[in-house]
Swiss-Prot record:
It is found in: Cytoplasm. Cleaves peptides in various proteins in a process that requires ATP hydrolysis. Has a chymotrypsin-like activity. Plays a major role in the degradation of misfolded proteins. It catalyses: Hydrolysis of proteins to small peptides in the presence of ATP and magnesium. alpha-casein is the usual test substrate. In the absence of ATP, only oligopeptides shorter than five residues are hydrolyzed (such as succinyl-Leu-Tyr-|-NHMec, and Leu-Tyr-Leu-|-Tyr-Trp, in which cleavage of the -Tyr-|-Leu- and -Tyr-|-Trp bonds also occurs). CDD domains: S14_ClpP_2. This is ATP-dependent Clp protease proteolytic subunit. One of its GO terms (cellular component) is cytoplasm. Its EC number is 3.4.21.92. The gene is clpP. It comes from Anaplasma phagocytophilum (strain HZ). Belongs to the peptidase S14 family. It is an enzyme of class 3 (hydrolase). Transmembrane segments: none annotated.
Amino acid sequence: MNLVPMVVEQTGRGERAYDIYSRLLKERIIFVTGPIEDEMASLIVAQLVFLEAEDPEKDISMYINSPGGVVTAGLSIYDTMQYIKPNVATLCLGQAASMGSLLLCAGAPGMRCALPNSRVMIHQPSGGFRGQATDIEIHAREILEIKRRLNEIFVRHTGKSLEEIESSMERDNFMIAEKARDFGIIDKVIEKRIEEK
């Protein structure tokens, strides 16, 4: 059972209760928590588009703690992050694995961060299919195409060569926050929030 805390806010019109995630959305903070699948991706995309409509000039923060998930669901979030006008700052807390790591590195340049004890994991896509030989061949070609596209995205956002990305993603590749920074997935490891003046 998931309990979502409520926050009570005093306004000129009395008290207003929000669930914590809705209140944080008001502050332009989106959470990507848990496995990335279609329903969750749809909610994240809707939040990104809503925040763009609210103020296309103001940055959005995306907090990521995800083991990864469905590639097409993750790519719908990725494409929306690239499509909307506001910069999306990404922050890894806990883990950003698989598709979670792709979303982490897709943040705006200079705005991709991780907390010191978080971990990042990159790898090639996996899948399985049963059926007729021709259908298996079609799906094998498709997963190789997905692998190529994901590699190109990591090349674009990390600055690494295609060869470096391919060899680094051959197997599960776990990184502590500092290693993820050195690899180009994030820009900095942060321990404390920097106060804006």
